[in-house]
Amino acid sequence: MATVDRWLLPDGIEEVLPPEAARIEAARRQVLDLFHRWGYEFVVTPHIEYLESLLTGAGQDLDLRTFKVTDPASGRLMGFRADITPQVARMDAHSLRREGPSRLCYAGSVLHAQPRALSTSRSPIQLGAELYGDPSPASDVEVISLMLEMLEMAEVPDVHMDLGHVGIYRGLARAAGLSGEVEQQLFDALQRKAVDEVEALTADLPAELRGMLRALAELCGGRDALEQGRARLAAAPADVQVALNELIEIADSLAGRFPGLPLYFDLGELRGYHYHTGVVFAAFVPGVGQSIAQGGRYDDIGADFGRARPATGFSTDLKSLVTLGQARLDQAVSGIWAPAEGAGLWQAVQRLRRDGQRVVQALPGQDAASAREAGCDRQLALRDGNWQVAPLAS
């Protein structure tokens, strides 16, 4: 390997230098403190574990994004976590085994074998919150509200929300009795709003059901899209009506809590269709193709760990949150430069550090010129037999 190649990092893998690392850490602490104030308990999941446990209930997409290695100790296949959410769901279902609602949060690096999109990081810092044990829309409203408060605290500008409900399509597909292959083709067509393809794929269905499936490709926009949905899906099965009413209830609650927030609804939005079971949501900012935060309801995942529990939550990439946010997270780099040695110097330095001061002590051979590079704007000087803090000599 040439010397120059030793400095190269793989595509999508980044190192974070000061002061950016300090900004990310400050944001992490602020967000976790926010979660704590809402009653969410912090958990830490393994970076690597056996593949069958890591991917249980997660679907093919996560499998493709997971780096895999063989464990030398057992010979079993292991994976580096690409998504922390399934790990936290396992904690709730298998390790904690609480009967009532459980609020958990997390923050940690994940690793993606494939990026989510072009030019995105393969080593994001995933941060999120999950609420288990309550099936009501009130839980969805809580986690969406927490997500929006997080974005507000980070001062992410011009946020708008996209909301949908996969239960609407699930109910119609179930009523149509679609085969797995046709259901997948119809899913793809709806994501592209390809009305002609939707018409072709549903040509053999009863006219009423065919019309409702086509409507999913057209029911998108502001609050009026929900009212149009009520009218155009009036003959839909009961489970579709329940899903639509849940979405309307959530939308009304959010409009009351965040009256200035732009809300966009898409009844054909099937993000995470093979994973989510209810409402799905994402926050976007203008000029950025990918969502800044996203989540939804995923009630079935706990069953794979022996205990099905209602669940809803969201996640974000902390690096992106800091990049897009305008909050003043810069920590002023200042400190006190102390000489390498001196009578009573150690005691003076320790007193200052206990008081919360940043003190950098010179190493042998270093002079005051090194103080600026170390981020110091003051110095510890011996005057009249006492160590005193003074301005750094220019």
Swiss-Prot record:
Its main location: cytoplasm. SUPFAM superfamilies: Class II aaRS and biotin synthetases. Keywords: Amino-acid biosynthesis, Cytoplasm, Histidine biosynthesis. Disulfide bonds: none annotated. One of its GO terms (cellular component) is cytoplasm. It is found in: Cytoplasm. GO terms for biological process: L-histidine biosynthetic process. InterPro entries: aa-tRNA-synth_II/BPL/LPL, HisRS-like_core, HisRS/HisZ, HisZ. Pathway: Amino-acid biosynthesis; L-histidine biosynthesis; L-histidine from 5-phospho-alpha-D-ribose 1-diphosphate: step 1/9. It comes from the Bacteria. This function is generally fulfilled by the C-terminal part of HisG, which is missing in some bacteria such as this one. PANTHER family: HISTIDINE--TRNA LIGASE, HISTIDYL-TRNA SYNTHETASE. NCBIfam families: hisZ_biosyn_reg (TIGR00443), PRK12292.1-1 (NF008935), PRK12292.1-4 (NF008937), PRK12421.1 (NF009086). Belongs to the class-II aminoacyl-tRNA synthetase family. HisZ subfamily. Heteromultimer composed of HisG and HisZ subunits. This is ATP phosphoribosyltransferase regulatory subunit.
